[in-house]
Amino acid sequence: MRELKHELLPTRHTQVFHEDKDKMEFNAPHHFVVVPAGSPLVDQQIHYGRGGNSKKVTVKDFAGKLATVNFQLGPVTEHGANGVMNEDLIAMVITRLQYFQNSEFNCRENAMAITKLEEALMWLNKRTAEREQRGVEGTHEK
């Protein structure tokens, strides 16, 4: 696995990893692991997929893993719901920030983050609606 690096992602407390490019399917990473910063690596076998479609993939797992996120792999119409959607994670973060906003921890920065995350959901929903209109949603067609 490789570490997710982004100039705006702090790594003081946690680090995020995803599968190597040669293990990716459908042009994007689908499997993420969040660990405490500086966690030692451990080899482990993990099964990805469902039933007869599952395949054994060697990945790097981590001692003290905090979370694993497996995104939808392939179109739902072809593969069924088998993972988290981008929109699901964005909605989770919005909900968490809204709870902070309804407490003594409210602040302008959280309000701005909520607005921008809601905007991100709007753009993703717009893309889906346009793909549905063209009859290509749930396929690998543009």
Curated annotation (Swiss-Prot):
3'cADPR binds at Q72, G74, R96, F100, F105, N110, R127, R131, G138. One of its GO terms (molecular function) is nucleotide binding. Transmembrane segments: none annotated. Keywords: Host-virus interaction, Inhibition of host innate immune response by virus, Nucleotide-binding, Viral immunoevasion. Disruption phenotype: Knockdown decreases phage infectivity about 100-fold. Pfam families: Acb2_Tad1_hairpin. InterPro entries: Acb2/Tad1_hairpin. Upon ligand binding the C-terminus changes conformation, enclosing the ligand. Although 2'cADPR has been crystallized with Tad1 (AC P0DW58) we have chosen to show 3'cADPR binding here, as evidence suggests 3'cADPR is produced by ThsB2 (AC J8CSK2) and 3'cADPR activates ThsA better than 2'cADPR (AC J8G6Z1). Belongs to the Tad1 family. Homodimer. Blocks activity of the Thoeris antiviral defense system (ThsA and ThsB, AC J8G6Z1, J8G8J6) when expressed in B.subtilis normally susceptible to SBSphiJ group phages. When added to phage SBSphiJ (which does not naturally encode this gene) confers resistance to Thoeris. Inhibits Thoeris upstream of ThsA. Probably acts by binding and sequestering cyclic ADP-D-ribose signal molecules produced upon viral infection (3'cADPR or 2'cADPR); sequestration prevents the signal from activating the ThsA of the Thoeris antiviral defense system. This is Thoeris anti-defense 1. It comes from Bacillus phage SBSphiJ7.
